[in-house]
Amino acid sequence: MIHVYNRKVETHHTNNFYIGRGSPLGNPYTHITDKKTKAIYQAKDRDDAIDKYSHYFDLMYGSNLAFTSAIDRIYELYKTGEDVYLECYCKPERCHGDVIKEKLESRLLKEKIQERMKKR
């Protein structure tokens, strides 16, 4: 299972991946206007920033080595049934970690369906 958690509130020591802006998986979009962030682009609000990250994910995966490697490391652990922890600062608010989680869950489901289709 993939868990997205707030690093200010929880700590996990195994299969933990930091996904904040200082990492290859960080969201380059921010809704925050009153303080400095490492974000490159301004979004209207939190939902806009996360929706844009979903598109960004699709653009980066396969075209950016650091991004793709990080996603693949997470996915390989998740695929084996290991619990994986995505560490951010947003939770319990909506977070780009939710996008990462959804994309990886969809990928695994697609692979399982394809495997079953091959066996028919």
Go through each PLM region and give its residues.
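Catalytic phosphate/metal-binding cores of nucleic-acid and nucleotide-processing enzymes, i.e., regions
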Residues: 1-120
